[in-house]
Amino acid sequence: MAKVDKVENKDAVVEKKVDKKSKKSSYSKKKKIKKNILNGIAYVQSTFNNTIISIADTNGNVISWASAGQKGFKGSRKSTPYAAQIAADSAASKALEYGMKTLSVEVKGPGSGRETALRALQARGFKILSIKDTTPMPHNGVRPPKKRRV
């Protein structure tokens, strides 16, 4: 006889089965419950080396995310606008499964994938309410690195 305990997780119900004879426990995960979320915030972090797109609900809970490196781009190809477009497309498709319709976009960083990621989100059918640039700008802070000599 196996004893079944239900453990409520934040997103899914996990059943813990304990076998009395062997005293081993195993976990089985049920299907994830998808919530219907209409509004969200897209965070686009574009550095010189990579582009990371996170899509969260209005409370700040991340629903989906993708990066150029996660999509299989390596090295200097991660910093291209095309890689940012593919990453934004992937994050958007996951967010569309939750029924998301409108986005407020926050862009951070000096990278080349900023505008391309925005266009990819808009092409996926999201209505973009606002675009906010949150790139940190120093008020004459630390000394910048010396110029490259190639």
Curated annotation (Swiss-Prot):
Gene3D superfamilies xref list: Ribosomal protein S11
Listed name of the protein: Small ribosomal subunit protein uS11
Protein family: Belongs to the universal ribosomal protein uS11 family.
Protein species of origin: Pelagibacter ubique (strain HTCC1062)
GO biological process, one term: translation
Binding partners and assembly: Part of the 30S ribosomal subunit. Interacts with proteins S7 and S18. Binds to IF-3.
One Gene Ontology CC term in the entry: ribosome
Top-rank lineage group of the source organism: Bacteria
